[in-house]
Amino acid sequence: MDKIPMTRAGFTALDDELKTLKTVERPAVIRSIAEAREHGDLSENAEYHAAREKQSFIEGRIKELEAILSLAEVIDPAKLSGSIKFGATVTILDEETEEERTYQIVGEAEADIEAGLLNIKSPLARALIGKDEGDSIEVKTPGGERGYEVVSVRFV
């Protein structure tokens, strides 16, 4: 399988989530299941079924995180330079609204647009890859085509 590019911060966040699921969440849900079993008939025991559903979610997320972390390739953006690539922190200017936004281009597993972490596979990130300060790009969005200018590129 292909390696999954990831920043150190993204790797640490996912690893911390995995540890919490294994050491806190999993034992708590096991206790909840045991307590619900004590209430008798399992066929109509809502607490039991809710706890089992939560256990299923936790186990699924643990498997997902283990798979992601086993394929992670941690990339240190501070060691990079040049045009926009994975790990770059990019400030862009929306040519229509004159609004500046800053994003760091990261892997899928750590992307969070609200936190300024832009998925490398997103249309905006794909349009930015390979560009330099001062370049302009056009991006197709659900609301139509948008133009942006690259204001700055940093590797931190």
Swiss-Prot record:
Leader sequence segment: none
InterPro entries documented for this protein: GreA/GreB_C_sf (IPR036953), TF_GreA/GreB_CS (IPR018151), Tscrpt_elong_fac_GreA (IPR006359), Tscrpt_elong_fac_GreA/B (IPR028624), Tscrpt_elong_fac_GreA/B_C (IPR001437), Tscrpt_elong_fac_GreA/B_fam (IPR023459), Tscrpt_elong_fac_GreA/B_N (IPR022691), Tscrpt_elong_fac_GreA/B_N_sf (IPR036805)
One term of GO molecular function: RNA polymerase binding
Chain segments annotated as coiled-coil in the UniProt record: 46-67
Keywords: Coiled coil, DNA-binding, Transcription, Transcription regulation
Record GO biological process: DNA-templated transcription elongation; regulation of DNA-templated transcription elongation
Function of the protein: Necessary for efficient RNA polymerase transcription elongation past template-encoded arresting sites. The arresting sites in DNA have the property of trapping a certain fraction of elongating RNA polymerases that pass through, resulting in locked ternary complexes. Cleavage of the nascent transcript by cleavage factors such as GreA or GreB allows the resumption of elongation from the new 3'terminus. GreA releases sequences of 2 to 3 nucleotides.
Family label: Belongs to the GreA/GreB family.
PANTHER family in the cross-refs: TRANSCRIPTION ELONGATION FACTOR GREA
Protein name: Transcription elongation factor GreA
Organism for this UniProt entry: Cereibacter sphaeroides (strain ATCC 17029 / ATH 2.4.9)
Species lineage: Bacteria, Pseudomonadati, Pseudomonadota, Alphaproteobacteria, Rhodobacterales
